[in-house]
Swiss-Prot record:
It comes from Scheffersomyces stipitis (strain ATCC 58785 / CBS 6054 / NBRC 10063 / NRRL Y-11545) (Yeast). It catalyses: orotidine 5'-phosphate + H(+) = UMP + CO2. SMART domains: OMPdecase (SM00934). Pathway: Pyrimidine metabolism; UMP biosynthesis via de novo pathway; UMP from orotate: step 2/2. The lineage of its organism: Eukaryota, Fungi, Dikarya, Ascomycota, Saccharomycotina. InterPro entries: Aldolase_TIM, OMPdecase, OMPdecase_AS, OMPdeCOase_dom, RibuloseP-bd_barrel. This is Orotidine 5'-phosphate decarboxylase.
Length: 267
């Protein structure tokens, strides 16, 4: 059943401090838009985020595709922008290894994701140990609260993340009520009757395009929100060729927020 509570109501009762903060931020900025900023240089990365910042609740990164990455040059300015525009950060790392390995991948290496990213995500293919490994890494790395999304469904054509795989991923999410805050999915994932309030973030959302040549499939904002999406993830629709990030940021923010108001019967 689709959750029709307001973001404020959900913030008041949620067990995760990350989810609480995110819901409150979404309500105060009146946005459920996440910008997926996949570009290859730090300068373009930061410039786009600065332009889109006023319209978003969350920025989604693939930090390992930035050719000139450095912690001081890329992450420190990103954190400054997150404070300037009041948004949270989601590193779309898609961890998919045993618990001990992901623990090191999350906390260390070049990117030190646990130090700066509020939210990250993981596949369920290796079992529930991945949740415990990531949670331990977060606890040992920072005093700041962190949250995990499980990849339950994908928007790409031919994805095998459905059916039994999705069901098993949901079961893994149930192993930790505080750290696992929700899913990357195309619809509501249930759990309310067992006391879970999972946040559903959905990629593959577009107001204009229906897909691309590499298997991406787009659904409309109204369609995804009405079936349970809490946060719409938009990338090329915001800053692709011929698109103005300021114009598109406002356009998608309004579309997402209006769909949320409709779902929660506030209009």
């Amino acid at each position: 059943m689709v959750n029709v509570q307001t973001y404020t109501q959900r913030a008041e009762s949620h067990q995760s401090p990350v989810a609480q903060r995110l819901f409150k931020l979404m309500d105060s900025k009146k946005t459920n838009l996440c910008a997926s900023v996949d570009v290859k240089t730090t300068s373009e990365f930061l410039s786009l985020i600065d332009k889109l910042g006023p319209y978003i609740c969350l920025v989604k990164t693939h930090i390992d595709i930035i050719d000139d990455f450095s912690y001081e040059g890329t992450i420190v300015p990103l954190l400054e922008l997150s404070k300037k525009h009041n948004f949270m950060i989601f590193e779309d790392r898609k961890f998919a290894d045993i618990g001990n390995t992901v623990k090191s991948q999350y906390s260390g290496g070049v990117y030190k994701i646990a130090q700066w990213s509020d939210i990250t995500n993981a596949h369920g293919v290796t079992g529930s140990g991945i949740v415990q490994g990531l949670k331990e890494a977060a606890r040992e790395t920072t005093d700041e609260p962190r949250g995990l999304l499980m990849l339950a469904e994908l928007s790409s054509k031919g994805s095998i993340a459905h059916g039994k795989y999705t069901e098993e991923t949901v079961e893994i999410a149930k192993t930790d009520k505080e750290f696992v805050i929700g899913f990357i999915a195309q619809r509501d994932m249930g759990g309310q009757d067992e006391g879970f309030d999972w946040i559903v973030m959905t990629p593959g959302v577009g107001l204009d395009d229906k897909g691309d040549s590499l298997g991406q499939q787009y659904r409309t904002v109204d369609e995804v929100v009405s079936t349970g999406t809490d946060i719409i993830i938009v990338g090329r629709g915001l800053f692709g060729k011929g698109r103005d990030p300021d114009v598109e940021g406002q356009r998608y923010r309004e579309a997402g927020w209006n769909a949320y108001l409709k779902k929660t019967s506030q209009v």
